[in-house]
Structure formats: structure tokens, C-alpha cells
């Protein structure tokens, strides 16, 4: 398959502002692709060469790419560096340079998808002495045979700036349309993706075998399962009404969510909430968890916390992040020792447990987990309908240095990749009006004026709707930034910049600049109000109105979270409703006092 055919589809996707149109282009691309290379097409379309959890990066900066482009086209690197700011996009620069060279070239070989993919794989795996020169030669080799449009997308993929805005869920929609009779099996496809998030492999399976191929996809050691997530409510009483009377109430530790895979021979892999392989920084966790489940093959869902080595107290999450380093691991282990609390069991000795009730998963976990000083079962209470008992346990959890509780339905199954009402967070800050920050995605920006001239004055922020796989605006945020953060912001967001509103963004507000929804920020506001302009919760609380966060303030970037981990539209709606209840109670008290 020639890469030019793929590049033409990419050009159409890049130009569209409609999500359904994007899905249709992808469907046609997938149907025209030989099944044996569909995985490669999918990876390239997502700007990767492998599943994201494999952590394979091309490692090509702009300077290195310009060397390769100069070698391929004969245009001096200095000239390319002069033209780059004028065009403002590495892809457009490569397209321009190759078009200049094409006018003088008569002998080129058609580029195939296989050649592009295999070359980029070699680039990613080039390490050691001479690796940079090898990468330059490899990239120059495919650019030499590239047509101008092909060069545009090769440049963007290589420098990790593809910006098509296609995400895994968009690919699943297109695969469903192409190979699974439209929407009929879309839910099953997503369930399989949630337990085996290698979307290239899944694409190849459904293209070759259709719906029957999905039955072959199971939990596999070394492949992370997308974690189940919790909703939130403000009070013990509401939680009991929602999932009671019988509940499990677990400590919610201020640590890092870890999915730990253990083989019978003691091999261990650790994945973060975002499915990143974080095995290397945690040799202590590997050792004490493997001992605790010795003789078994397991996939555990856990929370790991940093401990004060002198007092044994739980340290804040930010302290644990000092463990995320490539160097000085031994020293970090001594300064920030850890304890891991296991709270769920997804797989045991070849058997998937996702469809077992939490009751049964917990019993099995207690049977196989040989607790030690560092690997422990989560602290929890089984409570049967007693709200006061739940409130007392909540206060106890807070006194013990935790964030609060996660309350769970003992009859619930493990819904991988789903934020459902079977798990509900009860945290200290939910007891008050919007003291709890939310995590929102940057989808646009507005140029600053006066002191902020030359940088962004405010960001357009959005919540995520997993049901629709779109981002809906909830505020314009211009407060809370330091001068240094403001100065750095255009460069920080440059890689995500696009020239039109992204198809997965629902917005009534026109921004000066638009972004692919990737970057997540923590935001704190005064309250949530009805809005005639913002689209979050549109028509769901009141007709012709959405919801907005009033006086939003920037609290920091959440680099540990992806866009799909952001606060959801439903959570914003629930926070608004709970806020109304608090206001009503306060007004009633005031009237009684009067």
C-alpha cells in the first residue's frame, strides 16, 4: 500500500471539523488497507509506531529532523531554519523543501506504508554511539523518495506533532463501522480494548476475523488493563442511598494508582493509571509484592504511598513523585520508602476475574495475598446500611492521613476503563462548596493584552464526556498563573496547536488559538453556575443552558493524567446539584435562625 494514499486521507481529516466525517474517512482508510498491515496504519494514524503502553518513542527533535531534511533535499540547514518560522509548522516546512527538491529529481521510488513504518521503527530503536547519525540517514532515506504531501505527515509523525486529533475512541468507532456491522458490536469492541489496549492488534484481529476475533482477546500478563474509576458524592447519606445498604468502605490513600502484573517466576511489571510502564523506579515494590503473591500469576489493582521513614506517616502524593526518576533510584528508595495497598484482583493463574462480584474477588485476594510489612490489603470496613457508621469510618480514615474513602458495591463487577457508580469517592473537600479542584483539558486560548501581550491571557477549558467521546467547555481560565508560567505557555502548548476547533470539542466560544485536547490542568473555582455559552451540561440541567466554573484559578498541570482522565461532564453536573443542596440547607438554617 502506497503511503501517498494514506497521506491524502490524513489531509482530509486535518481539514474537517466534523467528528462523524472524520470517522467516515477513517472507515474508508481501514477498508482499503490490507488486513495484515492495518495495525501499522492505526499506529501511524495515532502518531505512534506501537501501543502507547510500550513506551516506544521516536526520540527525534526538530534539530535532528532538519539535518535529515537537509540531507534529503540538498537545502542547507541554515536555509531551513530561516523558513521554519515563516511556515510555523514542521510538516509544512518538509512539504515545501521536498517540493523544491522534486522539481530537480527524476528518479524516486514510491513509498509504501511498510517502508515508512519499518524505517520509523528502526529510528525508535536506534541507541548508543552513532545513533543520532543513523537516525538522520534513515529519515533522509524515506524523505528522498517522498512526495511533498507524504513529507508533511512523515515530518509530523517523526517529531510527534501529527495533530490529526484522532484518538483511540475515534479509531474504535471507525473499526466498528468498517468491520462490525456499524454500532451493533461497538460496546463489545470497547470492552475488549479496555482489557487489551493495543489498538493496532485489535484492529488487525477484527479486520481478519470480524466479531469472532474479539473472543480471542483476553487479559494478558504484561498488557495493562484500563483501570476502573470512581464517581464522587458529597455525603455518606447520598452514597448509602446510591449503592447501599451493604457496602465496602475503603481508605482512599494519597498515592499512585498501580496495576501490578506478577509472573510465577517472580517477574513483575508495574503500570500507572495512564498505562505507562513505571516498573524501573520501583524495585522495592517489585520485590515485596512478588513475595506477597509468590507461586501465583496475578494482576493486582493497588495504591502505593510514600512513607516518612522516621514516623511511618503517609506522605503527600507529590513526595511520592520523587520516586519517578531514572537515576538515583537507590537513594530515592531510602528517602521515600513505600507501602503498597492491594484493593482488587483482576486475574489469577490464567483466570479472568473481571465478571466476578467484588465480594468474591476480595475473598480470593485475601486468600492469596500473604501480607508483609510493605504489601498489604487495603484497610476497609463492611457496613450494612448504617450511615453513622460510614461517617465515623470516614472521620477515622481522615485522621489516619488518607484523603477519605472509596465506597464500593460488593456485588459489582470490575468495569475496566469505566467511571461508574459502583465505586464512589467520599473525600474531605466534597463536604464543602467547590473546594475540590477539577481536572480540565485545554482546548483553546486567547491572546493576552497589556502585561500579557505576546502570550496567552486565558485558556479555554473543557470537561470530558465519555459517553460521546467529546470535550465540552466549562470555563475561560486566566487566573492563578505566575509570570514565568505565562511566559512559557505558548511554547508548552505549541505541539498541540491546530488552525481550527478540534472535531471532538463542543464549544460555542470562538478562541484565538485552538489545540488538540491533550493537556490537562488542575482548576479550582468558587462555584459552578448556569451558563448561556458554555456547553458542559447543555440542556441537562436547564433548557438552553450549560454549566460554568466561576472564577477559575490554575492550580498546576496534571502530567500524570491524559485527556480521558479529566473530570467528566457528569461529575460537573453532580457537583452543581450537590452545591445547590448545600446552598438550600444554608438558606433554611438562616431562615430558622432569623
From Swiss-Prot:
Signal peptide bounds: none
Family note: Belongs to the ATP-dependent DNA ligase family.
Example GO molecular function: metal ion binding
Catalytically driven reaction(s): ATP + (deoxyribonucleotide)n-3'-hydroxyl + 5'-phospho-(deoxyribonucleotide)m = (deoxyribonucleotide)n+m + AMP + diphosphate
HAMAP family for the chain: DNA_ligase
Keyword field: ATP-binding, Cell cycle, Cell division, DNA damage, DNA recombination, DNA repair, DNA replication, Ligase, Magnesium, Metal-binding, Nucleotide-binding
GO biological process: cell division; DNA biosynthetic process; DNA recombination; DNA repair; lagging strand elongation
Ligand binding (ATP): 250, 257, 273, 303, 343, 419, 425
Catalytic residues in the record: 252 (n6-amp-lysine intermediate)
Function: DNA ligase that seals nicks in double-stranded DNA during DNA replication, DNA recombination and DNA repair.
Name of the gene: lig2
Highest taxon in the source lineage: Archaea
Protein name stated in the entry: DNA ligase 2
PANTHER family named in the record: DNA LIGASE 1, DNA LIGASE 1/3 FAMILY MEMBER
Class of enzymatic activity (EC top level): ligase
Necessary cofactors: Mg(2+)
Enzyme Commission number(s): 6.5.1.1
Record InterPro entries: ATP-dep_DNA_ligase (IPR050191), DNA_ligae_ATP-dep_bac/arc (IPR022865), DNA_ligase_ATP-dep (IPR000977), DNA_ligase_ATP-dep_C (IPR012309), DNA_ligase_ATP-dep_cent (IPR012310), DNA_ligase_ATP-dep_CS (IPR016059), DNA_ligase_ATP-dep_N (IPR012308), DNA_ligase_N_sf (IPR036599)
One Pfam family in the UniProt entry: DNA_ligase_A_N
Amino acid at each position: 500500500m502506497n503511503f501517498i494514499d494514506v497521506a491524502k486521507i490524513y489531509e482530509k481529516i486535518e481539514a474537517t471539523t466534523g467528528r462523524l466525517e472524520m470517522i467516515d474517512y477513517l472507515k474508508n482508510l481501514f477498508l482499503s488497507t490490507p488486513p495484515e498491515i492495518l495495525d501499522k496504519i492505526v499506529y501511524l494514524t495515532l502518531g505512534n509506531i506501537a501501543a502507547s503502553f510500550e513506551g516506544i518513542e521516536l526520540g527525534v527533535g526538530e534539530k535532528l529532523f532538519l539535518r535529515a531534511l537537509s540531507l534529503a533535499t540538498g537545502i542547507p540547514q541554515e536555509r531551513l531554519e530561516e523558513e521554519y518560522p515563516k511556515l510555523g509548522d514542521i510538516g509544512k516546512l518538509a512539504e515545501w523543501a521536498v517540493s523544491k527538491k522534486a522539481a530537480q529529481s527524476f528518479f524516486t521510488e514510491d513509498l509504501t506504508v511498510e517502508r515508512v513504518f519499518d524505517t520509523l521503527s528502526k529510528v525508535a530503536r536506534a541507541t548508543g554511539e552513532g545513533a543520532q547519525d543513523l537516525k538522520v540517514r534513515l529519515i533522509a532515506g524515506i524523505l528522498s523518495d517522498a512526495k511533498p504531501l507524504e513529507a508533511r505527515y512523515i515530518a509530523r509523525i517523526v517529531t510527534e506533532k501529527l495533530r490529526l486529533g484522532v484518538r483511540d475512541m475515534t479509531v474504535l468507532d471507525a473499526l466498528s463501522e468498517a468491520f462490525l456491522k456499524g454500532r451493533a458490536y461497538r460496546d463489545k469492541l470497547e470492552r475488549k480494548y479496555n482489557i487489551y489496549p493495543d489498538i493496532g492488534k485489535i484492529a488487525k484481529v477484527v479486520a481478519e476475523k470480524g466479531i469472532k476475533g474479539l473472543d480471542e482477546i483476553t487479559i494478558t500478563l504484561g498488557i495493562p488493563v484500563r483501570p476502573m474509576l470512581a464517581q464522587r458524592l458529597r455525603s455518606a447519606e447520598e452514597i448509602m442511598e446510591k449503592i447501599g445498604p451493604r457496602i465496602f468502605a475503603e481508605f482512599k490513600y494519597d498515592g499512585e494508582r498501580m496495576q501490578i502484573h506478577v509472573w510465577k517466576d517472580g517477574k513483575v511489571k508495574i503500570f500507572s493509571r495512564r498505562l505507562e510502564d513505571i516498573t524501573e523506579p520501583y524495585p522495592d515494590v517489585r520485590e515485596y509484592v512478588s513475595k506477597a503473591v509468590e507461586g501465583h500469576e496475578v494482576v493486582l489493582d493497588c495504591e502505593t504511598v510514600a512513607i516518612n521513614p522516621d514516623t511511618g506517616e503517609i506522605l503527600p502524593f507529590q513526595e511520592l513523585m520523587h520516586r519517578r526518576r531514572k537515576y538515583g533510584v537507590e537513594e530515592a528508595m531510602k528517602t521515600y520508602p513505600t507501602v503498597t495497598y492491594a484493593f482488587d484482583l483482576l486475574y489469577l493463574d490464567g483466570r479472568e476475574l473481571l465478571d466476578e462480584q467484588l465480594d468474591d474477588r476480595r475473598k480470593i485476594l485475601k486468600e492469596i495475598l500473604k501480607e508483609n510489612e510493605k504489601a498489604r490489603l487495603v484497610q476497609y470496613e463492611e457496613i450494612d446500611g448504617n450511615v453513622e457508621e460510614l461517617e465515623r469510618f470516614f472521620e477515622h480514615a481522615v485522621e489516619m492521613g488518607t484523603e477519605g474513602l472509596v465506597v464500593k458495591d460488593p456485588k459489582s463487577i470490575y468495569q475496566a476503563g469505566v467511571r461508574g457508580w459502583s465505586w464512589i469517592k467520599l473525600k474531605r473537600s466534597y463536604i464543602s462548596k467547590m473546594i475540590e479542584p477539577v481536572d480540565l483539558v485545554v482546548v483553546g486560548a486567547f491572546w493576552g493584552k497589556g502585561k500579557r501581550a505576546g502570550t496567552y491571557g486565558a485558556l479555554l477549558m473543557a470537561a470530558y464526556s465519555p459517553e460521546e467521546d467529546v470535550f465540552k467547555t466549562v470555563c475561560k481560565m486566566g487566573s492563578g498563573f505566575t509570570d514565568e508560567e505565562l511566559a512559557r505557555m505558548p511554547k508548552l502548548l505549541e505541539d498541540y496547536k491546530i488552525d481550527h476547533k478540534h472535531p471532538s470539542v463542543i464549544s460555542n466560544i470562538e478562541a484565538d488559538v485552538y489545540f488538540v485536547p491533550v493537556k490537562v490542568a488542575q482548576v479550582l473555582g468558587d462555584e459552578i453556575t448556569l451558563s448561556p455559552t458554555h456547553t458542559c451540561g447543555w440542556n441537562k440541567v436547564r433548557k438552553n443552558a450549560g454549566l460554568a466554573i466561576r472564577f477559575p484559578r490554575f492550580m498546576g498541570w496534571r502530567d500524570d493524567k491524559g485527556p480521558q482522565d479529566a473530570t467528566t461532564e457528569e461529575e460537573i453536573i453532580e457537583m452543581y446539584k450537590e452545591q445547590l443542596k448545600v446552598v438550600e440547607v444554608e438558606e433554611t438554617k438562616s431562615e430558622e435562625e432569623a
